Amino acid sequence: MTKIEWTEKTWNPITGCTRHSEGCLHCYAFTMSKRLKAMGLEKYKNGFELTLHEKELELPKRWGKPHMVFVCSMSDLFHSDVPFEYIDKVMNVIRSTPQHTYQILTKRAEIMSKYFSTREVPDNVWLGVTVESQTLKWRIAHLQEIETKNVRFLSCEPLLENLGRLNLDGIDWVIVGGESGPEARQMKEDWVLEIKEQCEFQNVKFFTVYAETRGSVSYN
């Protein structure tokens, strides 16, 4: 199982990544990878260095009952160093396990858009992008241009500033959350409220997760 509030299971056929934008400063996966390496786990012997795990590809086929599955919680499926041929293998497993619903979240929206420009999105995949600041709202447009009948979602986590006006055309779900821990950058309650109001106006589902905020936030 997983502590991530908006999913049920995680599947990591890739581990490791590189910091890509300001939301990566206090990366949970980076810290956890170092810890797991120190514990001697073979899968994490490379620490946070990008690593493909072919042996992990078949794992979802062993899960009997349907699950909501977050893909690559310890990496980014659309990292620039992940070959499209390997992503094809991941998608083949997804298609062969229609009982599961897979959530794919990326900070590399332009690569995801390029990948799906020549490929169909599997019927059991939700696609999402991370938008933590105003300067990264361009990622939303890349998500919107992908042809899919399935859920498109935004993860505004960690939310680092007021995002301003959002075009949520074709977006089904928005997740908002702040950082946790002693060095967490504070999230202001009015930033969250503004996103919530825009979601309500544009008929988009809204979900908040744990947050370090100035003021309490509880809107689920």
Residues of each region from the PLM?
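C-terminal accessory extensions appended to soluble enzyme cores
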Residues: 213-220
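N-terminal [4Fe-4S]-dependent radical SAM core
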Residues: 1-70, 76
